UniProtKB/Swiss-Prot annotation:
GO terms for biological process: glycine decarboxylation via glycine cleavage system. The modification N6-lipoyllysine is found at K65. It comes from Crocosphaera subtropica (strain ATCC 51142 / BH68) (Cyanothece sp. (strain ATCC 51142)). The keyword Secreted does not apply. Residues 24-106 form the Lipoyl-binding domain. The glycine cleavage system catalyzes the degradation of glycine. The H protein shuttles the methylamine group of glycine from the P protein to the T protein. Its cofactor is (R)-lipoate. Signal peptide: none annotated. The gene is gcvH. This is Glycine cleavage system H protein. One of its GO terms (cellular component) is cytosol. Coiled coil: none annotated. Belongs to the GcvH family. InterPro entries: 2-oxoA_DH_lipoyl-BS, Biotin_lipoyl, GCV_H, GCV_H/Fam206, GCV_H_sub, Single_hybrid_motif. Binds 1 lipoyl cofactor covalently.
Length: 133
């Protein structure tokens, strides 16, 4: 299966992605992470109004194979969470970069927050180095 890495996104080495539109960030997990986890069975996300701090876990995702913490690429306040994905996490795999988003966050300092993220090209290169995808 050919994995997609949309060019308009930024990625973390822990496999979360961010799409920034002004001061609003959409956060999700990459197709690679979903492929590695397998069938998703549980998703825990923060509540609307909660604060996120870049580098600190904001929730977890579990599959039949593993459980992983989720990390925000940015700091900010949760303004929306994808309730449908909490109810049926297995459908995240159907469209991870579209309907499978996890959170929307109002970012405190959009220009400063993305410096530790990877471009699609760099993310793919990292994965090729690790896994030979």
């Amino acid at each position: 299966m050919e994995l997609e890495f949309p060019e308009d996104l930024r990625y973390l080495d822990s496999h979360e992605y961010i799409r920034l539109d002004g001061e609003i960030a959409t956060i999700g997990i990459s197709a690679y992470a979903i492929e590695q986890l397998g069938d998703l069975v549980f998703l825990e996300l923060p509540e609307v109004g909660d604060s996120l701090e870049r580098g600190s876990s904001f929730g977890s995702i579990e599959s039949v194979k593993a459980a992983e913490d989720l990390y925000p690429p940015v700091s900010g306040t949760v303004i929306d969470r994808n309730e449908a994905m909490i109810e049926t996490p297995e459908v995240i795999a159907d469209d991870p970069y579209g309907d499978g988003w996890l959170l929307k966050v109002r970012v405190e300092n959009p220009d400063d927050e993305l410096e530790d993220t990877l471009s699609a090209h760099d993310y793919r290169a990292m994965l090729e180095g690790e896994e030979g995808i």
